[in-house]
Amino acid sequence: MNIRLYAVKSDRPLSEAERSTLARFLPPERQDRIKTSEPLCAYALLCRALHELYGLEDLPQLSYGEHGKPYFASHPDVHFSLSHTRGAALLAVHNEPIGADIECLRPVSGAMRTRFHAANDADFWRLWVQRESRCKRAGISAVALRDREVPSFPNERVFALEPFPDYTAGVCTCSDADIDKPIYLTVKELI
């Protein structure tokens, strides 16, 4: 199976009706905590992908790894990584561990650029999503590694993507699978 990517971008705030409709995709333990549009869209992407790829009608019960990485204990062959940022969400799905991160390009401090050896803001965010996707694939807390390098893993590959103008993303895998062309959806299509 190739790595499947799903992405959504919203250029406007969601209406209350849209929020309510998207909230039905949230796992029960997150329904009281998640109120912003980006994570709502991320879980809607996950539900859609699970239905399209595996025929699952409902979101399986989530379990969480030592550092909070979500997984489906009832479906150990389904691996996914959710990411969201200002106005966008990204999902990667595969049959092996996968990590994905998306960020909106925005200004960062000179100190942060220096720390990551980044020439400019866009370069910083490209390096950042690569680091985050590697951590997410491995199930490692990026916060715990704040001042250290992310360990390397055999056969690790990181793909750089520009899913939307002014956004950058990274997808990490240790498999030899290719990435399918991302499936871009609108909020209306998710509802």
Predicted regions and their residues:
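Core catalytic alpha/beta fold that binds nucleotide/phospho-ligands
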Residues: 1-191
